Amino acid sequence: LLQPEEYESIDWESTPGCVNYGALYQKRYAVLHKACARLLAAPPADYADFLAKNAFWLPDYALFMALKDAHNGVCWQQWEEPLRRREPETLAAARAKYAADIDFWQAVQYLFYAQWHDLKAYANAQGIEIIGDLPIYVAEDSVDVWSCPQEFQLDENLVPTEVAGCPPDGFSATGQLWGNPLFDWDAMAANGYAWWVRRIRHLCGIYDVLRIDHFRGFAGYYAIPYGDKTAENGRWRTGPGYALFAAVKKELGSPRIIAEDLGFLTDDVRALL
């Protein structure tokens, strides 16, 4: 898709042993657009199959990224109200208007997954297994929250009611304010934790083992009022517990999972482990 001179001529501002990720992020798009244009002009034989297999997330992701570009990268909460609320006619118009950008972002994902699976196959052939990290939470400015607001604790204006973090302790007198939207565990339970099942199923396809970060959040999680500047006013709430993993086991069997062990655990977390 690319000739060596098309990427070797670019100053990536990196040195051996040190990658300038800021420069890489800014300068890669010209090269990616060129590669994706050539891919889309003559799609690989498995491209349509890739789109079909990833239809549960890829169209929303590609549209989200296209809209982020169109809005100069601002958070989706600052988009026009019809886009924020995903009104069907507005989304249809956006898909038509930004069709080329959507195609680009889907092609980028195809290239990534093709390269990733090649890397994983090589590692596995050498007797190496890859452990993938699975953060429990997602960012507010994410396609997950924008496309599935019903899965999160948001108010009628799509604003988080409470956010994630940790209480004050010996390391911080004011606690940790992470700011991630919290899951609406009741809503998730009502649909069989489908969002989590999809997430874990997908990640099991690209890693050999999953490590779940902040595993204790499934037993009990700390909720901080949205807008607070510290975590001091938060309170503990009960998580889904084993019900979530029972749903995962029902759909996926017994995926290989590593649960983060913080060392000092409460009884509810220890029981879940």
Model-found features: residue ranges?
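Alpha-amylase-like alpha-glycosidases and glucanotransferases acting on alpha-linked glucans and related
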Residues: 1-113, 138-273
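Conserved, well-ordered alpha-helix/loop/beta-strand core segments that scaffold catalytic motifs
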Residues: 105-138
